A protein has these predicted regions:
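Catalytic-core regions of hydrolytic enzymes
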Residues: 1-41
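Second-shell loop/turn segments in exported
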Residues: 1-4, 10-13, 60-69, 112-121
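Extracytoplasmic/secreted envelope proteins and their assembly/folding machinery
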Residues: 4-11, 72-79, 108, 124-131
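Loop/turn elements at helix/coil->beta-strand transitions in domains of secreted/extracellular proteins
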Residues: 17-22, 50-51, 88-89, 106-107
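Solvent-exposed loop/turn segments at secondary-structure junctions
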Residues: 28-33, 59-62, 98-101, 115-118
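A short, glycine/acidic-enriched catalytic loop
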Residues: 31-64
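Active-site-adjacent substrate-binding region
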Residues: 67-94
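Active-site-adjacent mobile loop/cap segments within catalytic or ligand-binding domains
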Residues: 90-142
Length: 142
């Protein structure tokens, strides 16, 4: 499946570039009502930006992923940075039982950038805000 192909790519890049510290897996979420109508999730501080969500994999499904809490700490640090200027940009962090290939580094994040109901412009604006917050978090050593 898609995650097996993604895993092969991650392994290849980590082997070729062993200094890689962070792996970002970017998605658009599918949030819809019972009739299949897609929800459009927007940041309250910037109506032109979609909301974001971190999905953190764990070892809850039985597969080895002992350091998953390191990824959770990173997600929380980035979310805290973003919260200062954009309190409604981030949806709550979700921890799931699957690994989502996050066992490959302790700097792995799955980022849901808006939903299928958001426009491309809203997703790009949110991604720019995320990138600035991610960089600021790293610069501050959090």
């Amino acid at each position: 499946g898609a995650y097996n192909r993604s895993l092969a790519s991650i392994e290849s890049y980590l082997q070729k570039y062993p200094s890689i510290s962070f792996v970002l897996d970017v998605h658009r979420d599918a949030v819809q009502d019972a009739n299949g109508q897609q929800f459009k999730l927007l940041c309250g501080e910037d109506k032109n930006a979609a909301q974001l969500e971190f999905v953190i994999g764990s070892n809850g499904g039985g597969l080895s992923h002992d350091l998953w809490r390191e990824n959770l700490k990173l997600a929380c640090a980035v979310q805290e940075t973003l919260y200062k200027d954009y309190p409604t940009l981030m949806r709550p962090v979700t921890v799931r039982n699957s690994r989502y290939n996050q066992h490959m580094t302790t700097g792995s994040l799955l980022v849901e950038v808006g939903t299928a109901g958001n426009s491309l412009e809203e997703a790009i604006n949110a991604a720019r805000i995320f990138a600035a917050g991610f960089a600021k978090t790293l610069q501050n050593g959090e």
